[in-house]
Amino acid sequence: YGMSLVCFVVSLFLKRRKALLHFATVFLCMAVLWHLFGIAARMYIQSRPPVTNLYSSVVFAGVVASLFGGTLYILRRQLPVAAVACASGLLSLLVAMNLPYSGDTMGMMRAVLNSNFWLTMHVMTIMIGYGSVFFAGFLASYHLVARFFGQGEKGLKAGACGVYRILLVALFFCFLGTMLGGIWADMSWGRFWGWDPKENGALMTLLWCSCTLHARLLHVCSCQGFLVLASLGNIVAAWGWFGVNLMGIGLHSYGFVEGGWFWFFLFVGLQVLAAASAL
């Protein structure tokens, strides 16, 4: 991911970049395939779905964002999309490596998580949703920072259009994942919704995506304002995903880790700076 990211970023400033883009694309494809192989190996060893704890959720969301971005790049040949795809994959693996786990990341699953079909579908769909939200947020942040350094209005509008479409996908999977989570909760402890911190986090992310899309659809905000909302959506998603796990409470929080607040608030600060670059 790192090599591909460097190649894509350098190519942004070159006129003759065909060969460099070819190498960057090959590196990205190799990284995504190796990422997928790692997930498949964990599934084979554990005989479990790809998402069983906070570590595996980060790894899975990262490959979703990279695969999503890489596919969009191949179809549309937009360099910012490719660069964000590489950055998303690289960041996910770095975060996973530095999570406050001690020892094995493939430990025994808790009894309530060692469950059924509905749990598998819930975690898969909700993590695809979160991965899409973060990809849209990072792409929005890129265009806001690029605007600060002189990107034209045409590039801003193209970026807003791409982010809008990605958020549509994110909204669909966040909604589906939240509903499937309710079905699993009903089967596990007899209630569909109980305002558990994890449930509240998923609902916050879902509502933020919906509000952001409606603000753009109803022309409540400009392209730049829409990108700001999409960028801030990363903070909402990070809280719904990481924050409630780091709190260490809740019935079906799959993180079960302590610590990490420094990195969480560092991420929040960087996202606020990216959004503030629109001012």
Where do the protein language model's features map onto the residues?
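Hydrophobic cores of alpha-helical transmembrane segments in multi-pass integral membrane proteins
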Residues: Y1-F13, L21-R48, T52-G107, W118-F149, ...
